[in-house]
Amino acid sequence: MVMNAIRRPRSSSPVQRVARRLVEPAVFDFWASRVHPLWSWERPLARLRERHQAAEGAVTLVLQTNRHFAGLRAGQHINLGVELDGARITRSYSPSKVAGNRIEITVREVEGGRVSQHLCRHARIGEVFALGAAFGTMTLPAAVHGPWLFLAAGSGITPLMAMLRELDAAGMPVELDLVYWARTRAEVCFADELAALAARHRGLRVHLRLTRQADGPAAPRIDDTDLAALVPELGHRQVFACGPHGFVQSARAQLEGRVVRFEAEAFTPPRALPGEGGSVALTLSRSGRTLTVPRDASLLEALEAQGLRPASGCRMGICNTCACTRREGITRDTQTNARSGEPDATVRLCISAAATDLTLDL
């Protein structure tokens, strides 16, 4: 099966190495963007070429990438940087289609979400976004064998749709059931395409589970008994699941160990475990600033509350965009409550809280 390969990053040419001594890449990027919006020294960028309504409350954006984007595999995620009110805000998205230098992301508007609201309501053709390197391990295996099961809830359909499209291009070489939970039929993304795929491939079956449909009974949440009745030979399946954290945890608890393989990704972070109250001193070694931060908030949230904007992406400990060095002090993992105090160790701001006075390389 043909897989979407990640391209090898371009190395600096001799001309670039000489030119770097004469001009800063940031200065080059500023002037180059006046000539062509996707020109840059080495920064991966993408320009919005098309936008389509994907479902109620969701849009699909077609992006053209520049030559510095190294590519990705179906099922992976990318960080998308959006300029809002003079500041760049980064969020993670799973492309729903990958084709050469074109990628598609399908974004559902989130209440209070500045980036999703901008992308769904205000982003215009020609707008340029910063791109991060691809990350994520839930991709199509090189060897295709046995029946598969895709489990999607809400926006969790997007990475699985990218994988479905790649399987379609390869002639659907596997028997596959997709079970897709959405609140209402109007919120089902890719409804027509999914129906067409199922009609084209005898081995593909699509099951929609609507949990809040007004004109019919509500489908049950994920349940192993329901799945066993819906999907033949459940125990022989390779399972790929994506959805909110609670959905993924429920799927894992019910299926892991009972199926041939279980792979999953969540698009929301787990609920942070409660920490100790009070506040501590946080010193930023590069700027020399010392802040007072709460012990029960992630370091990323605490810094943002002080008006700072450290680099971030997924906000749930996966992409490592927010990683920095802890010089001194003890941090607490907000997902496990485990503590760590090794000096000069890397911490992820989005899932770490200060347990004691702390010094970070920021």
Q: How does the language model describe each region?
A:
Residues 169-176, 329-338:
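Phosphate-handling active-site elements
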Residues 30-128, 132, 145-147, 182-184, ...:
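Ferredoxin-reductase
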Residues 159, 304, 308-333, 342-356:
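Local cysteine-cluster metal-coordination motifs and their immediate loop/turn environment
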